Structures are given as C-alpha cells and as structure tokens.
Design a protein with these regions (language model features):
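Hydrophobic core
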Residues: 13-20
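Substrate-binding/charge-relay-adjacent region of secreted/lumenal peptidase catalytic domains
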Residues: 21, 26-88, 93, 98-359, ...
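An often Trp-containing, charged/polar helix-loop segment at the C-terminal end
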Residues: 361, 402-403, 455-504, 524-525
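Short glycine/serine- and small hydrophobic-enriched flexible loop segments
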Residues: 448-456
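Ser/Thr/Gly/Pro-rich low-complexity, disordered linker/stalk segments of secreted
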Residues: 531-538
Length: 538
C-alpha cells in the first residue's frame, strides 16, 4: 500500500524547502546542468563513495524513429560502449562501464550508499545530447540505478468502529449488482496483478469461505513470490469479491527493483504479460518513485510497452498514491515540513497510457447503498489520495477541455477514484484475521474488478475489449445521459481540493458501474463510428 505513516504538517506544504549543495569540482565537457529537486535530495541524503566502479551501467535514449540507430551504435563503439536496441523500437539503451559513460557524456558518475544501505550509481547532472548524435537521438535519460519503490506494509486496524464493506456491500455501493444479477461475474476474463509480495493460500480460502464465494488459487508468473505483506492479499481478495469467476494472475515484479535498468525491466515485464494475457485487465498497487526523479526518455520503454498492451485490448489501472499529493516526499524524513519540491505524482500512475486511481472515504447505509463520498485525507496519519499535475507529459487529447487553474498543458492525475479510507474499506482476510483494507492500492483493484464486469458486458453487447479505456471514460463523462460517476466535491489532500467535475484529488469520481458500462459501450460505438469501422469489427 502506498502510504507513509509519520505525521506531517499539512498546513506547511507551501513552504519552500531550500536544498543546499556544495560547489562542484567536476569539469563538464557538454554543459550538463545540475539536477535539482527530489533527485538532488536523494543524493544529498546518501553517502558519496566517489567515482563509480560499476562495470555495467546504462542510460536510456529516445530515437528519432524506429530504424536501426547506426550513428548511435558507431558513436558508442568509439567510446567503448555498446547499444542495446530491438528492431521497431524508438528507444535504446547505452551500456558500458560507469567511467566510460561518464567520459562519453561528460558528466560525473559516482557510487552512493543510500539511507537504507543500498549502493547505487548516479550522476548529479543531466547528460545532454552530444552533437554527433542529433541525427539519431532525440532525448537522453538520467543516470541513476536506484529508484525508491512503493509498497509499505499495510496496517489493517482490528478495532475499527465500522465492520467494513462486505463483497455484497461493495457491489451495491458502486451499482454493480445489476451486472452481477445479469450473470456478469468475470467468466472468461483475466485480471493481472503486478506485486512485490506474495499471498498465503489460507487467507484466500478463508476469505472465499467467509463470503460463500468459490475458492480460488491465483496463477503466479515470474518465479516464487516474496512473503506476504498484505498488498497482494488485499488486491486478490477485493477483486475476487467483485468478479469471483475471473481468472486471477500475480506477476512477480520484485526483479524490477533489483539492480539498474528499472524501466527497461518494467517494459519487458509488461510485454511478457501482454503476450501471455491479451484482452486482460491489469491492476498495479505498487510504485517506482516520484516522476521528478526521472525524465521522459527514461520511461519511453514503458510507454511503448503500454501502447502495445492497449493494442491487445488490455486496460491498466494504477494506484495514484497515499501521500496526499506529496509523492515526491516519499519515504524521506517526515519530521521536516513538506515543501514545493515534495509535491508531485507517481511515475507510472501518471503515464497517459495508465488509468490512475485516487481514493475516497465512502459512506453507505446498512445495506451498502451509496450515501456520500469524499476525497480521502487523514492528516494525523499523513495519508490521503494523491494526485496532481505531471511535469513530464503533455495534456493527452482525452483531457482536453478540462480547466485546472495551475496548469493548462500537462497530464492530470488521477483519472478516477474509489474507496481508500481504511476506516470505510473492504473486509478482507490477512494472517487468518478479519481486517479492513485501505489505500489507493485498494481503490485500484476495485476499479480493475469492476472493469472486468463492464468488459464482459461490453463484449456481450457487440463491443470490443475496453483496452485503452481513458478516452472512453472521459468521453462517457462528457456526453452521457446516464450518470456514470459519483462526482466527489468534498474533502481534499495536502495540495488540492475536489470541485464539481474533474479534480486533482478524485479525478472524474467513483463509478456508478451499471450506468458506466452502458456509457462505455455507447462511447466505444461513437469512437468506432468516428474511426470509420463498425463496433465489434476489430
């Protein structure tokens, strides 16, 4: 669960955090600028071990096209480096010894020991594009072999004042019961979860037995999973509560945070999952750091992979984060007041190809009927729904027309929301005990599970796999007669407040599922007509 539990001073979020840095002693050959913000803070909090001794370092470059980058390959060879590139890709990886990369790009590359003992290499400066490569290369990534990942051990209170949502209450609250009653329970659908931890089959069995659901054993891809910490268990049980007939798969993502090349590993992992499970629904409740640690070139492989996944009919949901809009503060010392450099969004959740899911506090009656919903914020616990404005990505077409006072040109997150407050969350079983789930890492599998039902409905009524769902969600929000979302207008986080329509805390809102399923089918048909082919025709 993306949450950090040390108390923060929400009122201090607009204070400026001054980052002191000593004078540079490195001579630069290409005028590479010093990287500031959270990247500089990460290095400042680490011990500089001197020039890197890494024998296998890398950085990502984006290419002008998908043809073989001959100039780049020749240049790298002349600098004792290599290029890793696959035909058809518009990005490549420059690899070699750290000192060779430092010399070639004219930047220092040092080894660092982080606050938790991890050793990594990094350059405090942004490599610039060598003039000799301008015919092939359009962008150069950062040199950094470590990204702080997000998956804190969830804390499920045993003494909450409410019993939590049962599976039936969850379906009722989000108006999914009409779909279930019509027979849409996930049969023939596949839900894929990407996880850093594992699950205990005894928990899953107890959960299924408690609620008279069919027992289930998820398929595991990518090798043995780490011991359960609560995240994977919550994801699986929440999804099974919604779509008990769906096939559930857990992909072991831990290798992506071991060593360098994180985004290359993520992209290859996504490519493999897309090949194995076409037309599936993906749910991510983990994170790979604040986007201010990277630049657009670094994540180009992941964006390419997700675009290919969309072509296979895959929809992707990711938790926006639990730091109340302060994703760039991350796991750093919460005894210091947050400042502007701490405001930011999660790297993967902010990608335009991903549906980012924020969090709410949900109020229902005794039968689970929706009564009210507010943006989730818990000041004493330093938690809340994350969201904000991307620094890296232009405003996607599907968000054109949305008015946000502090930005007009960039990607906005989250896209949607669901219950995340652990005091109003879903009843689950963890450690053979009843618990209440929470966090946006609960909200993401809720949306993924509900999308399984909607996908099944759309297919059964002449549509296509929902796949790249964001354009459909925004089209449905703009032009449908049936209300498809609960518009969240109260609550807030450390940075923004919700308001009527789209906002940076809860996006378009939480789902009114049966209505939304019909609206998505209508939006898909309208999209198909505009594209010049018949719905259901591919």
């Amino acid at each position: 669960m993306k949450r950090y539990r040390t108390a923060i001073l929400i009122a201090a979020v607009l204070l400026v955090v001054a980052t002191a840095s000593g004078p540079s002693v490195w001579r630069l050959t290409h005028g590479a600028p010093v990287i500031s913000g959270p990247f500089a803070a990460l290095l400042a909090a680490s011990t500089n071990l001197g020039p890197s001794r890494a024998s296998d370092a890398q950085l990502t470059v984006t290419l002008r096209g998908s043809a073989r980058p001959a100039t780049l390959i020749d240049w790298a060879t002349a600098h004792r480096l290599a290029v890793r590139w696959q035909p058809g890709e518009d990005f490549a990886f420059v690899t070699g010894a750290a000192d060779g990369i430092a010399d070639a790009f004219g930047v220092p590359v040092h080894d660092y020991r982080g606050a938790h003992g991890q050793v990594f290499y990094a350059s405090p400066r942004q490599p610039v594009l060598p003039p000799a490569l301008r015919d092939d290369v359009t962008g150069v990534g950062r040199i950094l072999s470590y990204l702080p990942h997000r998956m804190a051990r969830p804390v499920f209170p045993l003494d909450v004042p409410r019993p939590g949502l049962t599976p039936q209450h969850l379906l009722t609250a989000y108006n999914a019961t009409p779909l279930v009653d019509a027979g849409y329970r996930g049969a023939g659908q596949t839900l894929v979860f990407f996880s850093f931890d594992g699950f205990d089959q005894r928990d899953l069995d107890m959960f299924a037995d408690t609620w008279a659901l069919p027992r289930f054993t998820p398929e595991v891809v990518g090798g043995p999973l780490a011991p359960p910490e609560g995240e994977a268990v919550m994801d699986l049980e929440v999804a099974h509560a919604i779509a008990p007939e769906a096939r559930l798969v857990v992909v072991n993502a831990r290798h992506t945070i071991e060593g360098d090349g994180t985004f290359e590993k993520i992209a290859r992992m996504f490519d493999d999952a897309a090949g194995r499970f076409p037309a599936s629904i993906w749910s991510l409740s983990i994170g790979w750091g604040c986007e201010a640690l990277v630049n657009a070139a670094d994540v180009a492989p992941v964006r390419s992979s997700l675009t290919n996944a969309h072509r296979r009919g895959i929809a992707v949901f990711d938790a926006s984060g639990d730091t109340a809009g302060l994703e760039c503060k991350g796991g750093r010392d919460w005894s210091a007041a947050p400042g502007p450099n701490d405001v930011g969004v999660d790297t993967i959740a902010s990608l335009p190809e991903v549906t980012s899911v924020g969090g709410t506090t949900l109020y229902t009656d005794a039968d689970g009927r929706w009564m009210d919903e507010r943006a989730w914020i818990d000041v004493p616990m330093s938690q809340g729904s994350s969201g904000g404005v991307s620094r890296l990505f232009a405003r996607p077409d599907y968000q054109r027309g949305i008015t946000i006072a502090r930005d007009t040109d960039h990607r906005l997150v989250p896209d949607v929301a669901a219950v995340a407050d652990p005091f109003t969350g879903v009843q689950i079983i963890f450690g053979q005990n009843k618990r209440i789930g929470g966090g946006t890492s609960q909200a993401a599998p809720i949306w993924a599970g509900l999308t399984v039902l909607m996908n099944q409905y759309v297919l059964d009524n002449g549509g296509r796999p929902l796949g790249d769902i964001n354009p459909l969600l925004y089209r449905a929000a703009r032009g449908s007669n049936r209300p498809g979302f609960h518009d969240i207008t109260m609550g807030g986080n450390a940075v923004d407040n919700p308001n009527p329509g789209y906002d940076l805390v809860t996006g378009l809102g939480s789902p009114i599922t049966f209505n939304l399923a019909q609206n998505l089918l209508d939006a898909q048909k309208a999209q198909s007509v505009a594209a010049g082919f018949a719905p259901g025709g591919g």
